Amino acid sequence: MRQILFAAGIALAVSILLTPVLIKAFSRQGFGQEIRVEGPASHQSKRGTPTMGGVAILAGLWAGYWGSHLIGIGYDADGPSASGLLVLGLTTALGGVGFLDDFIKIRKQRNLGLNKTAKLVGQLIAAVAFGILALQFRGANDLTPGSEHLSYVRDIATVTMGSVVFVAFCYLLVSAWSNAVNLTDGLDGLAAGSMSLVLGAYVIITFWQYRNACETSPGKGCYDVRDPLDLALICAAGAGACIGFLWWNAAPAKIFMGDTGSLALGGMLAGLSITTRTELLMVVIGALFVAEAASVVIQVAVFRSSRRRVFRMAPFHHHFELAGWAETTVIIRFWLLAAIASAIGLALFYSEYLAAIGG
């Protein structure tokens, strides 16, 4: 538990202290956000706000994770694990793709960075590497970081994918979650605040898996998850980094996370869902991100078939803005929805555990 607190605290401190440094540096360099012309008129005043703040989130994540392990040496805590390093690597790789996207936007002074093909290729390389490596590194109980079984709260024994399909599934999750968080990052603090809630829920899940791991506590309801405590450190560091960044990103935002942050955080969700064996549960806990992405899919599909729009604008947080809601009202209510989804997900997780032990 101490390591988890250290990870969150260090990440928060690094993120909250580094972000204003980045604001000044990026402002000096002219690294400002371009705004969609067709977006809400109120957003035009945000043009030029520094972007690529995801650098601070990634720095906080790395500092929190490695700092907690360095402190852990003092009381013989376990070192870094395959699962933790894989999720950290996937998060960083997606952050790198986002950084390139942001940098091109800034240099070309437009709201479009990497083209769709280049972005998909970047996601593909990161996801395939993660998927292949996730089936290696067998540890205690012959567990690997990933599993060829589809999972809800634990592996579903009757649904086996095979290694090739598993790697393809990893790409689907990485692409879906990174794009979902990217689409949600359209209002000040919306993505950072929502991610803090989701990662907070996953701190609880991973710590519970650690306390009830089949390796150390075999019996009814135990979890076959490799390195759950190390995954808890990743979640705690990620949550702390998001909260520290949110201090400066809350409305009115002094800096945006950009694709550097949103793609990285989406990659983290994908990696965590795979390594914690909660691929389907993540859909519930991350329901806000799912809804934002679904609103875009629905809008495009309906418009192409009927030339009509379901929403005034997609992602649908803009729909409510155009309906007259103040931006801060949309943000706070969406945070509440994210909190409710996280609470429902935790309830489902615990109820499955009670059912497993016969409670």
From Swiss-Prot:
Its cofactor is Mg(2+). The chain crosses the membrane at residues 3-23, 53-73, 84-104, 117-137, 156-176, 187-207, 231-251, 255-275, 283-303, 330-350. One of its GO terms (cellular component) is plasma membrane. It comes from the Bacteria. Pathway: Cell wall biogenesis; peptidoglycan biosynthesis. GO terms for biological process: cell division; cell wall organization; peptidoglycan biosynthetic process; regulation of cell shape. The keyword Magnesium applies. Its EC number is 2.7.8.13. Signal peptide: none annotated. The keyword Cell division applies. It is a multi-pass membrane protein. It is found in: Cell membrane. GO terms for molecular function: metal ion binding; phospho-N-acetylmuramoyl-pentapeptide-transferase activity; UDP-N-acetylmuramoyl-L-alanyl-D-glutamyl-meso-2,6-diaminopimelyl-D-alanyl-D-alanine:undecaprenyl-phosphate transferase activity. It holds the Pfam family Glycos_transf_4. InterPro entries: Glycosyl_transferase_4 (IPR000715), PNAcMuramoyl-5peptid_Trfase (IPR003524), PNAcMuramoyl-5peptid_Trfase_CS (IPR018480). Belongs to the glycosyltransferase 4 family. MraY subfamily. HAMAP family: MraY. Catalyzes the initial step of the lipid cycle reactions in the biosynthesis of the cell wall peptidoglycan: transfers peptidoglycan precursor phospho-MurNAc-pentapeptide from UDP-MurNAc-pentapeptide onto the lipid carrier undecaprenyl phosphate, yielding undecaprenyl-pyrophosphoryl-MurNAc-pentapeptide, known as lipid I. This is Phospho-N-acetylmuramoyl-pentapeptide-transferase. It comes from Rhodococcus opacus (strain B4).
